Amino acid sequence: MTDHKPSKSLPKATAKRLPQYYRLFKSLVEENVTRTNSQLISEKIGVDAATIRRDFSLFGELGRRGYGYETKVLRDFFGELLGQDQETHIALIGVGNLGRALLHYQFQDRNKMRITQAYDISGNPLVGTQTDDGIPIYNISDLEKNVKKSDIKTAILSVRKENAQEVVDTLVKAGIKGFLNFAPIRLKVPSDVVVQSIDLTKELQTLLFFMNDNKQ
């Protein structure tokens, strides 16, 4: 297989499918399946075979015509792309209802992503305590100081949209390079900082649209 890493111009839609590919090949290896093809991959993840082949072509030769794809090779390839072997420590900002759920969320087995710090305003009674898993919940006034002293480069935002930009500005100064943002606002960040936003209201509205469209 050609050793080929994606360029920064990798289409966003393709990038969003990378975790699907990794989970599928990981599952196939665990099921002792050694080889597969684009049609079988399509049936497993609900993406058409032509799109899968086009995605894979962006990385060089991941398989061979008439032979297919070796599951272990592609599991390792996509795992490396997604940093599965890297220990990733994450700061969570906002310990309201959603934040508490995220604190207790168990990332997939053998995944090395961990929330190691959480923050909220002083009025939250959880500030100054820690979770059953030992995650400390700090006052947000300590945010910049603590993050600067840590190895954390990734943050999850679960704050009100009115406060989101101010929090992001503080975290960027502290060295954060990536945000998973649940606030319904477009954040302004430097060009070397990545933001992935999840708007739950928008996602539900899209779901309802497709549900209503199916009725017609």
Swiss-Prot record:
NAD(+) binds at G94, V95, G96, N97, L98, G99. The keyword Transcription regulation applies. The keyword Cytoplasm applies. It is found in: Cytoplasm. InterPro entries: CoA-bd, NAD(P)-bd_dom_sf, Rex_DNA-bd_C_dom, Tscrpt_rep_Rex, WH-like_DNA-bd_sf, WH_DNA-bd_sf. One of its GO terms (cellular component) is cytoplasm. It comes from the Bacteria. PANTHER family: REDOX-SENSING TRANSCRIPTIONAL REPRESSOR REX, REDOX-SENSING TRANSCRIPTIONAL REPRESSOR REX 1. This is Redox-sensing transcriptional repressor Rex. It comes from Lactococcus lactis subsp. cremoris (strain SK11). The lineage of its organism: Bacteria, Bacillati, Bacillota, Bacilli, Lactobacillales.
